[in-house]
Regions:
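Glycine-rich beta-alpha junction loops
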Residues: 81-85, 108-113, 169
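Radical SAM/AdoMet-radical enzyme domain recognition
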Residues: 1-105
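Short secondary-structure boundary segments
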Residues: 41, 108, 166
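Class I S-adenosyl-L-methionine
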Residues: 90-94, 110-119
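Accessory C-terminal segments flanking Radical SAM cores
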Residues: 113-177
Length: 177
């Protein structure tokens, strides 16, 4: 990575991970030019995490996030909002990430057309979720991008940016090139 960064005009090198090995590799990733790490984390509840990851240890993820932050790597949490699984944790996730000054992006469940698995039962409209959260946080839209389709907001009640990716209720392909 380090040699690639020196030969490119990239402003940022970003990596996406589940975070389980981040503690071990955070320092080396920073030394090799990684500026930001997106951590896929759909819950901060240990029991739910264990269930969704099939016996994963959320403490390893938390330790990895802390190690990355200690090495001055920006972190963004990506959370797929899943009906009857984590929809009741949204405010807790906002507060947890705000306390750590970590940006957070909520993502709608997307259909998996290449599989036989229907995910419609997991769907929650992020447009509806945003409306509910906006009543609490009074969001202000900001001109910020991480190179993807998320719409970002801030609030006087939080220290971080909150993003929303809504492929179904707000077709993000409308802004694709």
């Amino acid at each position: 990575l380090n040699t690639k960064k020196e030969k490119t005009t990239l402003k940022e090198i970003t990596l996406t991970t589940n975070g389980t090995l981040l503690k071990k590799y955070a320092k080396q990733l920073k030394l090799n030019g990684v500026n930001r790490i997106n951590v896929s984390l759909d819950t901060i509840n240990p029991e739910k995490y264990n269930k969704i990851t099939r016996f994963g240890n959320i403490e390893k993820v938390f330790d990895g996030i802390n190690e990355a932050l200690d090495n001055n790597i920006k972190i963004k949490i990506n959370t797929v909002v899943i009906k009857d699984f984590n929809e009741n944790e949204i405010e807790e996730l906002i507060n947890w990430t705000s306390n750590k000054k970590i940006d957070l992006t909520f993502i709608e469940v997307m259909p998996m057309e290449e599989t036989d698995i229907s995910r419609e039962y997991q769907f929650i409209s992020l447009s509806d979720t945003f409306s509910k959260l906006d009543k609490i946080y009074n969001f202000s839209k900001i001109d910020y991008s991480t190179g993807g389709p998320a719409r970002f907001y801030t609030s006087d009640l939080v220290s971080n940016k909150i993003g929303f990716i809504s492929p179904l209720t707000n077709n993000f392909c409308a802004s694709c090139n």
